[in-house]
Structure formats: structure tokens, C-alpha cells
A protein has these predicted regions:
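Short, solvent-exposed loop/turn segments at the edges of secondary structure
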Residues: 120, 141, 297, 354-356, ...
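Solenoid-like repeat scaffolds
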Residues: 603-609, 639-647, 676-682
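Non-catalytic C-terminal accessory modules of carbohydrate-active enzymes
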Residues: 2-20, 668-803
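Active-site acid/base region of carbohydrate-active enzymes
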Residues: 1, 323, 369-372, 376-403, ...
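Alpha-helical repeat scaffolds
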Residues: 630-639
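Alpha-helical support elements that line or immediately flank enzyme active sites
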Residues: 299-316, 359-364, 424, 428-458, ...
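Extracellular/oxidizing-compartment recognition motifs
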Residues: 1-418, 430, 446-447, 451, ...
């Protein structure tokens, strides 16, 4: 589309280019002719397949409130390049092991002698051979020589650039004689195997480039630079990235509006013919802030009357502190867009789905008053029905279930995604948890199947399932690869769908073959040069042997062995169980009897890590992987961990801790933990559940988490129906349901849980020494009451009716 500017940065690691739609040209745009890329079934897609999930919803969602209006400083002027485009044109990879070394140097004229605070992204900067002094760079009046050298070389760096504040008078138009220095012997593209922290070639390239960059930053003038780097080549202005609209929002400096600047801004909230009026102010732009009332995702839609060239910048954030500080989720996420107006009426619906709660609309380059008619969100999610529900005597638990369900919905498009704002990506480990949550909350079996298929297809190119798909980041997280295997088991257990199991069975086998090749012959443990990750805790994790990977591997072997007869290959089960026993024996041999725990890792020289965490013990409890003599300590580490054990940081890992507590027969403790872990979110008015537990991720930050909407944290959707309602599938296909509610935490509870046969509902209430339980279930489901420690003291009165 010609109006879409092409020379723009990416939104984030996994998202497409920044949306900048220039509609200011009065003439009809000239479209380029289409070019044949490949025959319909001959491209990298191999073949066309029928859609296997529903189209996304489109629902108008209005803002709840107009929050504020401000005058803000005009936009920063940026000088930036996209390193991939310069070094590897056409490449779309974002691997951390990619090496993107280059230098940019240019002359720029300053209108006066001044100190300037330069905004930077991904680069170190020198001006006339000097760095910053007290955070500011000194510019002479007239010509100045500027050098940019990348801080990091890896492929996650989408932009190398700087921004000049508007009051400095330094502009991109004043830049001249720009040169680029490439380092072809150091530049490389490489999949993340080995991962950058374990990649000797990547580390060597970094070591070789660092002194070159440091030397370049000390060069005071162009002539010295060209002498040092004779391979420098002119860089055309067209190779520079367009103005970075998001940078100007991040660095906004707000001032109060004055009378007459903005009239009737609340009119924008309503879809009628009334208009807010925003008038131009000399030397300032006007910013309007709106509140959706809760986090949401979709496409911005707006209508306004404006002069040609008026710029509309739209940016959204998830959270702002009580003192007004804005949290920009990142790093490197441009959760914004730009629209440049034509003369007269402008109506636009954004092409990219974006998320947030607080939305900032900044009008720039106004030459005449703007009449702003409407602004809304076209909500776009997977079209789910809330078949699951939960209500009990504790209002906080009801709200926790509600925001968990909303979070999951916002992280569902044509796949499960990690979050609606930062990446919008199918992370395979996240998807395993989200699949369980979605089956027990929405009955979204089609999306579960789709995610299993998509992730499994990565085995065409990799020995184990990739950590995220589809992707330009070829990275394996072994724990995620094993969790993909669990997803296959989870789906079969929930639905009894043997046909789908047989479809993906070759993928299950190949994933385990890749894992078997990673077993270290010396230790007998899983060892891989990958991103070895499970939780965001700050443990000793940069090594090939992380012990939690061996626990996950052992469980993947067990689940596959159970599935083998269903898939028609029962003879495979014994071999996998033997591998599992070998892994468990190897794990227990490295138990630290002094610290009564497993070391977190084994270093490349054979040294045992000095770190110990709760994670290995809770996985050993969950997966039945501890020798008898270690089980008491494993239980203690899981239930009452000592202070020296690294704790769980993310609600993602909490899911596995909760599951371990259930395995240990402590369902009440899980309900207590849900209240303890999620209440801090409620206390600050969260409308979705967070990526991290408050304050554990970064105790020194004003912001309690990175992502404020992360569906890997929606574990209450799984455990509240299972424990508080007591709805427990007893076998594959939910043909039989056990009813065993934990009743000593609440006075009453009710709700529903979907199954492949329809919804199962439970309503229970204590009346003196009687416990009344009403169950509704489809006729084909067998229902059985299972007493537990909390029900023994009651006379149970159970009734059942059809759904």
C-alpha cells in the first residue's frame, strides 16, 4: 500500500514494521505491480491448508473516560538505521546470535554552542570525539562530528539511533556527509543454537568489535575517522529510518493546557456527530489521554476533520503509577502508530492490533483547528464464549478468576499468545499452560489443536520443538519443547481424541529423539546449548546442564509412554520408561546431601552450581522423580522452602508449584497461595493478571511487573474449578468426573467447567453440618463424589440434574 511508509523500525522483536500511514498526498497513490513470489503451492509455505480456527472478532469498544489534555513539546528529530536492512537486506531473522556490527558517522550543524541530552537506542555516541558529561553531549556552534557505535550486536537490536530534543535546533535535515562502516568478517546470521550466552563464535565477534567501536568513538573529526576506516561508504539519506514517533511519546514533556486549547474533549467518547475542537499552539503539540477502563486489544478507529499534513500519533500503555509515571513495556516495543492527515475528513482503522488501557492521542504539525469526531477500539480477539464460570463467598477470589479469564481472552488470536502488547507471539511453554486454562474456561479445543500443530511443524528444521512459532527467532527452550509434549497429552486426556494424537504422533517421537541426543554420556543428564529457561528468577542458568531440564525430559518420556498404546505403538513405551529411569537415577546421584537440595546447574568444567532453588524440588515432587531417601526434603523444599532457596518469581512457574502441592495432597494451600499471590494485583486495580509476581522481578522499580497482561499467569482458571468446585476429570475424554470440592476456605461456591461433552456445573453450600452439592452434567458423563479431608465432617447431600 503506497501510503504506508516502508523505512520504519519494527514494533518489537516479533511484530511487524511500525505503522505510519501517510494520507497527506492529494493525488491518488500509484500502486506498484504485484510480483510473483512463488507458485501457489511452491513457496516456503509448501501447500495451502484449510483454516482450522475461527476468524477473530470485531466488536466496537468505547473509551470509558477522558482523562486529561496536555501541551507537549514537539517531536524529537531522529537519526537512525535498521542494522538488518543495511547488512543483510531482506533478512527478517531476530536471533540473539546474529552479529550486526557497523558504525555510523556524520556531520551536523548546531545553531549555537550547547549541551544536549541525546536520546539513544542501541548505541553509544560521541560528539567531536567526546562522550557525555553529566548525561549531556557538548556541541560547538556550527559543524560537529558525531559517531554512533552499537552497544549490543545481537539480532534483537532492531534499531541503532539517536534523537535530538526539539529545543536543540538539531534536526535530521541538518545531518550531512553520513558514512557507514561495515565489518563483513564479523557480521553473521546464525540460529540460536548455541544460544548467544553459550555461543563462542558470537562472543568472539563481540570481543573483536568492542575495541574497534571504542576507538571510533574517540575520533574527533571526519578526516581521522576516514583514515582509520577507509572502507567507510556514503550512506544516502533514504537509508535512514523515518522519524521515530514512539520516541517522542516516551520522552514527552507535558505542560498544562491553556483555556481555548481544547474544547469538549469528552465528545470524542461518543459515536455521534459532535466534535471536540483542538487548536494549534505555537511551539507545542496537543496530547489527549483516554481510559478504556480495562486493558483490551484491537485496532484503533478514528474520525477527524483536519488540514493536510496534520499528524495523529496514537500510543497506548498498560499502567501508570499513582504519581503519574508512565510504564512503557519493553525494552524496544513501539506500542504506537502514526497517521498523517489529508485535507478535510479523515477516517482510519489501524491495520495492526494493539493493546493497552491508557491511550494517548497527540496532534502534531497543526496549521488549523482539528475537529475530532470519534475515537474507539475495534476489539479483536478469538471469538470465545465464557463457558467456564466461578463464584464463591470470597469476592477477591471471584475477581481473580474474572481478570484471569479476561487475560486469557486477550491472549487468544489465531493462536495462544504470550501477551497482547509486547510480542503477540505463540510461545510454546506459555501455550501449554494456556491450553489447559482455555479448555477449562472456554472449551477452546480447536485453538489447542492448532497450536500443537504449528509448534510441531518446527521439527521440520530443528531437532526439538522451537520455543516460539511462527518466528524469525530460531531458538529452542528445552523446557518449552517438553511442555509441547505435555500439551499433546493434555489435549488427549481432556478430549479422548485418538485421531488427532495419531496425526501428531510422528512429531512427538521426533521431539523425543532430539532430546535423547542431548543426554550427556558422562552425567546422564539433559545437556543442550540452548536458552535454558524456566522462570525469571536470578539463578545460575547460563550453562548447558540445568537440572530442571532433566526433570521436564523425564516427564515428557512418561507421558509419551502412556500415549504410545493409544497411538498404535505400544512397543515404544518400555524404551522411553527406561530412559526416564536413567534420568531420574542421574538426577538423584547429584543430590546435595549437605544442602538437602539439587544444585541448579552443572558448569562446563563439572563444578556444581552454588545456587539451589525451589524449582527442582517442586518438579521432583510433581513428576515422582525423587528417590525415597530424598522425598522428605523435597516435600519440605516445596511446601516450606528455606530462605537460601531461590523462590518462584513468575505465575507461570507458580502453575507447576501449585500442581506439585496438589500432588502432595495440599489443595487448601493452593487456594491460600492463589489469594496471596494474586491479591497484590487487585490492590492496584489490575484488570488483567501480570507476567511476574509483584516486586519479585525488579524490587527497585516503580512498576510491579513488565507485562501487565500475560496469560501464562491465568492458573486460577484451572485450579479454582478443580479445587474450589471440585470438578476433576477422572480419565481420558472426561467420560467420568469426580466431584471433590475443598470446602474449608469458603462458605459456598458455584460455577461451571466446559468439557468435550458440554458444561459441568457445581453449586455447593454449607448449612450447619450438612454440605449440599448440586451437580449438572451431560447425560454421557458419569459423576462420582470423592470425599476429601474437608468434607469428612459433613453429611453430604448430593443431587444431579441434566445440563
Amino acid at each position: 500500500m503506497p501510503q504506508l511508509r516502508r523505512n520504519v523500525p519494527k514494533i518489537s522483536i516479533q511484530q511487524p514494521p511500525f505503522e505510519c500511514f501517510d494520507n497527506s498526498e492529494p493525488e491518488a497513490p500509484v500502486w506498484r505491480k504485484a510480483v510473483l513470489v512463488a507458485p501457489a503451492e511452491g513457496g516456503p509455505w509448501k501447500e495451502l491448508k484449510e483454516r482450522d480456527c475461527r476468524l477473530l472478532s470485531r466488536r466496537e469498544f468505547l473509551f470509558r473516560d477522558f482523562v486529561s489534555a496536555h501541551r507537549v513539546m514537539p517531536a524529537y528529530s531522529t537519526v537512525a538505521v535498521a542494522p538488518h536492512a543495511l547488512l543483510f537486506p531482506g533478512d527478517t531473522t531476530v536471533n540473539t546470535s546474529d552479529v550486526l556490527p557497523l558504525l555510523i558517522a556524520f556531520e551536523i550543524d548546531s545553531p549555537r554552542c550547547q549541551e544536549v541530552v541525546i536520546a539513544r537506542e542501541g548505541v553509544n555516541v560521541s560528539v567531536n570525539g567526546r562522550g557525555a558529561d553529566g548525561g549531556a553531549w557538548h556541541f560547538n556552534e556550527g559543524g560537529n562530528f558525531v559517531v554512533l557505535a552499537p552497544e549490543n550486536l545481537n539480532g534483537h537490536c532492531a534499531l541503532y539511533g539517536i534523537g535530538f530534543p526539539p529545543e536543540s535546533g538539531l534536526t535530521a535535515e541538518a545531518v550531512r556527509d553520513t558514512v557507514l562502516v561495515r565489518f563483513p568478517k564479523l557480521a553473521r546470521l546464525a540460529p540460536d543454537r548455541p544460544f548467544c550466552t553459550l555461543n563462542a563464535q558470537f562472543q568472539q565477534s563481540v570481543r573483536e568489535f568492542q575495541p574497534l567501536a571504542a576507538g571510533a568513538l574517540k575520533l574527533p573529526e571526519r578526516e581521522a575517522f576516514l583514515k582509520e576506516f577507509p572502507q567507510a561508504e556514503p550512506l544516502a539519506a533514504g537509508a535512514l529510518v523515518d522519524d521515530d514517533a514512539h520516541l517522542s511519546f516516551v520522552l514527552r514533556r507535558a505542560e498544562p493546557v491553556q483555556p481555548g486549547d481544547v474544547t469538549d474533549p469528552e465528545f470524542i467518547l461518543y459515536p455521534d456527530d459532535c466534535c471536540a475542537v483542538i487548536r494549534p499552539v505555537e511551539g507545542r503539540d496537543i496530547e489527549l489521554c483516554f481510559d478504556l477502563g480495562e486493558q483490551n486489544i484491537g485496532c484503533w478507529n478514528f474520525s477527524l476533520f483536519a488540514a493536510a499534513g496534520t499528524v495523529v500519533d496514537v500510543a497506548a500503555i498498560e499502567y501508570k503509577t499513582p504519581n503519574g509515571a508512565l510504564q512503557h513495556t519493553g525494552p524496544g516495543c513501539r506500542n504506537s502508530m502514526r497517521y498523517i492527515c489529508r485535507e478535510g475528513i479523515n477516517r482510519y482503522t489501524a491495520m495492526q492490533r494493539r493493546s493497552g488501557r491508557y491511550v494517548y492521542v497527540t496532534l502534531r504539525n497543526m496549521t488549523a483547528p482539528v475537529r475530532f469526531q470519534s475515537f474507539r477500539l475495534v476489539e479483536s480477539t478469538y471469538p470465545v464464549v465464557p463457558a467456564g464460570s466461578f463464584h464463591c463467598s470470597d469476592p477477591a477470589m471471584n475477581r481473580i478468576y474474572e481478570i484471569s479469564q479476561r487475560t486469557l481472552k486477550l491472549c487468544m488470536e489465531d493462536t495462544f499468545t504470550d501477551c497482547p502488547l509486547y510480542e503477540q507471539t505463540l510461545w510454546v511453554g506459555d501455550a501449554r499452560s494456556e491450553s489447559l486454562f482455555a479448555m477449562s474456561s472456554f472449551g477452546a479445543y480447536d485453538l489447542v489443536r492448532r497450536c500443537i500443530r504449528l509448534a510441531g511443524q518446527s521439527l521440520d528444521d530443528m531437532p526439538m520443538v522451537l520455543s516460539q512459532v511462527p518466528t524469525g527467532w530460531s531458538c529452542i527452550i528445552p523446557a518449552w519443547s517438553f511442555m509441547w509434549s505435555y500439551s499433546v497429552y493434555d489435549y488427549w486426556f481432556e478430549t479422548g481424541d485418538a485421531e488427532f494424537l495419531r496425526e501428531v504422533w510422528p512429531m512427538v517421537k521426533k521431539n523425543l529423539e532430539g532430546a535423547a541426543a542431548c543426554v550427556d554420556p558422562e552425567t546422564g543428564l539433559f545437556s543442550a546449548p540452548d536458552w535454558n529457561f524456566f522462570d525469571w528468577n536470578r539463578t545460575d542458568c547460563g550453562h548447558r546442564i540445568m537440572l530442571y531440564n532433566s526433570f521436564f525430559h523425564a516427564e515428557a518420556l512418561r507421558t509419551a509412554a502412556e500415549l504410545a498404546p493409544v497411538a498404535g505403538e505400544p512397543e515404544l513405551a518400555e524404551g522411553w520408561l527406561a530412559q526416564r529411569r536413567n534420568l531420574i537415577d542421574a538426577l538423584n546421584r547429584v543430590w546435595d546431601a549437605r544442602r538437602l537440595a539439587w544444585p541448579d546447574s552443572i558448569h562446563e568444567d563439572g563444578t556444581l552450581s552454588g545456587d539451589v532453588s525451589i524449582h527442582t524440588s517442586m518438579l521432583a515432587a510433581l513428576f515422582d522423580a525423587a528417590w525415597p531417601e530424598h522425598q522428605a526434603a523435597v516435600r519440605a523444599n516445596t511446601v516450606t522452602p528455606r530462605s537460601e532457596l531461590f523462590k518462584v518469581v513468575s505465575p507461570f512457574a507458580l502453575f507447576y508449584l501449585y500442581a506439585a502441592l496438589e500432588k502432595l495432597g495440599l489443595p487448601g494451600e493452593i487456594l491460600d497461595a492463589i489469594g496471596r499471590d494474586y491479591r497484590p494485583m487487585l490492590e492496584v486495580g489490575a484488570t488483567t493478571v501480570w507476567e511476574n509476581i509483584s516486586l519479585h522481578f525488579n524490587p527497585d522499580s516503580d512498576f510491579p511487573t513488565r507485562s501487565h497482561c500475560h496469560a501464562w499467569s491465568a492458573a486460577p482458571l484451572y485450579f479454582l474449578p478443580r479445587l474450589a468446585l471440585g470438578i476433576i476429570p477422572a480419565g481420558p475424554g472426561c467420560r467420568k468426573i469426580l466431584i471433590s470440592p475443598v470446602v474449608n476456605r469458603f462458605e459456598y461456591a458455584s460455577g461451571t467447567r466446559p468439557t468435550i461433552h458440554g458444561r459441568v456445573g457445581v453449586r455447593w453450600k454449607k448449612q450447619g453440618r450438612e454440605l449440599h452439592i448440586q451437580v449438572t452434567a451431560p447425560a454421557e458423563i458419569e459423576v462420582e463424589f470423592l470425599p476429601n479431608d474437608t468434607t469428612f465432617d459433613f453429611e453430604v447431600i448430593l443431587s444431579r440434574s441434566a445440563e
